[in-house]
Amino acid sequence: MQPYLDLMRHVHEHGTDKADRTGTGTRSVFGHQMRFDLQQGFPLVTTKKVHIKSIVYELLWFLQGATNVRWLRENGVTIWDEWADAEGELGPIYGYQWRSWPTPSGEHIDQIAELIAQIKRNPDSRRLIVSAWNVADIPRMKLPPCHAFFQFYVADGKLSCQLYQRSADIFLGVPFNIASYALLTHMIAQQTGLDVGDFVWTGGDCHLYNNHFEQVETQLARTPLPLPKLHIKRKPDSIFDYRYEDFEIVGYESHPAIKAPVAV
């Protein structure tokens, strides 16, 4: 995960100090790209312990098309609690847009199902895209999509994915986002009979919150460990039938966790 640490160091040392929506203050750069060869290991940060359970359950929750945190809480995942209302609702966020993008005629588009069908039918398409950035629905979202748009690419029997993340909380959010989309790429590759290729992460506003600087310096002083491997124990009938128990991260060794406050 050296590319991730390089981004963190670059922003910490050369970023521009700016105000932000949360009132916390950030140091940021605009525009950065990282590439991870998924054949070489699963891109999970090792310079601090990452909560794998939250990553897996959140992705399964997105794939359900869910927008209420109840199911996450039932499974011990609280990463969305700060944004949910009293009933646990978040509005038409990621899962809704992925699975039920509304059309002017009142119908809904299942972007994930259509994506997989397109990969199988026309793998050379340049339209293998899923978007969560629905401008009409943003006012009703508790938090507009940070990881907003992703595209797949098939070459030499391998499936690659590129994510565009408009807003990137480097210390807390980005390790989750990298692992989540790497996991999704593995799942879709399995469903479409392909091997995995690269995961490409592209960031817009890449920032460190001012109250994370001490934690950043601690993390940058640590030496990365070898990447783990992902093992998917079975192939379900569809992308929507995976369970938490289907995934095993093999050989994950990390430095201790580093706690930091979330900017809401």
Swiss-Prot record:
The lineage of its organism: Bacteria, Pseudomonadati, Pseudomonadota, Betaproteobacteria, Burkholderiales. PROSITE patterns: THYMIDYLATE_SYNTHASE. DUMP binds at residues 21, 126-127, 166-169, 177, 207-209. Its EC number is 2.1.1.45. It catalyses: dUMP + (6R)-5,10-methylene-5,6,7,8-tetrahydrofolate = 7,8-dihydrofolate + dTMP. It comes from Ralstonia nicotianae (strain ATCC BAA-1114 / GMI1000). Catalyzes the reductive methylation of 2'-deoxyuridine-5'-monophosphate (dUMP) to 2'-deoxythymidine-5'-monophosphate (dTMP) while utilizing 5,10-methylenetetrahydrofolate (mTHF) as the methyl donor and reductant in the reaction, yielding dihydrofolate (DHF) as a by-product. This enzymatic reaction provides an intracellular de novo source of dTMP, an essential precursor for DNA biosynthesis. GO terms for molecular function: thymidylate synthase activity. Pathway: Pyrimidine metabolism; dTTP biosynthesis. This is Thymidylate synthase. One of its GO terms (biological process) is dTMP biosynthetic process. Signal peptide: none annotated.
